[in-house]
């Protein structure tokens, strides 16, 4: 390790280009990973925020909440389960505007009611308000409505379909579902809006959400239970998008490592005479291997840390229109994978070093 470090200090110009390349490639991989997570969060953030809950749906919904309907009979059957506390949830895409004549804004209503336990509270911004505190025709909006549209607490927004005015009472953090910002309303508010276009409408939750660990065998044959991950995977477009972007991220990581392997190989060719001298003075191949791998590890580690740090520092300055979300788990996985694959690709040059003949190289007839 000491020999590897001393060589890097003695001839830094040889390693600066490779170091810069590692920093750039690592930055690209981490940045793309952040965008992948950010796009995923714009689809599933609120379901993720709710945590490890169980969702009771009708079997014909195929696990998609907006396609499900819980009937009064279903509700009575669920109530018979011992210790069953739940919250009802319905999800509805809609549009709102600040005034009758202003531009329409996409919104997804999360309409809720509660049995005993209130478990569908969003992450609130600057308030302890809960969903159960909502009065009729009040709404809690995602904070992006404030940041992007200038809407403030106390303002009103107009539901474009029912023409109902909703008073903004608070904002929630990262409240998104299906590429849309969320507006949290009570079941009474939702029922009132629906009855303006359909007077016969009666509130029916699309899903019953509970902390209780249950299975589909505990329910009637026309009901099923899913967990958070299954609900998120069933959001239209989420799974295909997420798998595609993650595949691109890992392909970029492998391609980056291969590029680094080529640079390490070129660097090895430039040092063949040096390796010949080392062999001539008695250094074994295992010792040379240790020096090379130590050098690869040092270079990769420094580059990865700097690239990761650069991407992390840049993330807070990205505009809201660029969804980026970095996690410690992903950053660690990428960093370890990047270092290991870089060392593996760079280690291929050891085959060339092993073939070095000290007599030929020192005599000037080597490659």
Describe the residue ranges of each PLM region.
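Short helix-loop junctions at transmembrane helix boundaries
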Residues: 290-291, 297-364
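N-terminal Sec/SRP start-transfer signal
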Residues: 1-29, 293, 366-367
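Membrane-proximal extracellular/periplasmic loop immediately following the first transmembrane helix
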Residues: 45-96, 106-112
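Mid-to-C-terminal secondary-structure elements
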Residues: 143-183
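Peri-transmembrane interface segments
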Residues: 217-273, 277-278, 289-293, 297
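Alpha-helical transmembrane segments
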Residues: 14, 27-54
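Small-residue transmembrane helix packing/gating motifs
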Residues: 88-92, 167-212
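The feature marks short, hydrophobic/small-residue-biased sequence motifs that occur predominantly
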Residues: 73, 88-133, 184
């Amino acid at each position: 390790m000491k020999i590897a470090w001393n060589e890097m200090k003695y001839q830094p110009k040889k390693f600066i280009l490779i170091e810069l390349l590692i920093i750039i490639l690592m930055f690209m991989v981490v940045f793309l990973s952040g965008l992948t997570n950010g796009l995923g969060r714009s689809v599933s953030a609120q379901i993720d925020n709710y945590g490890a809950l169980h969702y009771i749906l009708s079997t014909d919904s195929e696990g998609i909440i907006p396609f499900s309907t819980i009937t009064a009979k279903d509700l009575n059957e669920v109530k018979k389960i011992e210790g069953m506390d739940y919250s009802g949830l319905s999800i509805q895409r809609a549009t709102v505007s600040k005034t009758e004549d202003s531009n329409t804004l996409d919104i997804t209503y999360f309409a809720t009611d509660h049995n005993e336990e209130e478990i569908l509270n969003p992450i609130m911004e600057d308030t302890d308000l809960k969903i159960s505190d909502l009065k009729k025709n009040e709404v809690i909006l995602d904070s992006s409505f404030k940041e992007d549209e200038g809407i403030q607490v106390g303002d009103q927004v107009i539901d474009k379909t029912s023409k109902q005015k909703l008073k903004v009472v608070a904002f929630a953090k990262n409240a998104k579902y299906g590429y849309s910002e969320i507006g949290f309303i009570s079941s009474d508010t939702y029922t009132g809006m629906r009855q303006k276009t359909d007077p016969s409408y009666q509130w029916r939750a699309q899903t019953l959400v509970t902390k209780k660990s249950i299975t589909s065998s505990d329910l009637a044959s026309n009901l099923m239970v899913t967990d958070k991950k299954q609900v998120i995977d069933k959001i239209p477009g989420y799974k295909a998008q997420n798998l595609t972007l993650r595949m691109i991220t890992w392909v970029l990581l492998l391609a980056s490592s291969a590029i680094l392997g080529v640079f390490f190989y070129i660097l090895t060719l430039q040092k063949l005479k040096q390796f010949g001298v080392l062999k001539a003075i008695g250094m074994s191949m295992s010792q040379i291997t240790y020096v090379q791998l130590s050098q690869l590890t040092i270079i990769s580690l420094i580059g990865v840390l700097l690239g990761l740090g650069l991407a992390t520092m840049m993330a807070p300055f990205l505009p809201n229109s660029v969804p980026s979300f970095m996690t410690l788990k992903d950053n660690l996985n990428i960093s370890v994978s990047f270092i290991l694959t870089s060392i593996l690709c760079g280690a291929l040059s050891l085959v060339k070093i092993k073939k070095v003949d000290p007599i030929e190289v020192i005599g000037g007839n080597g490659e």
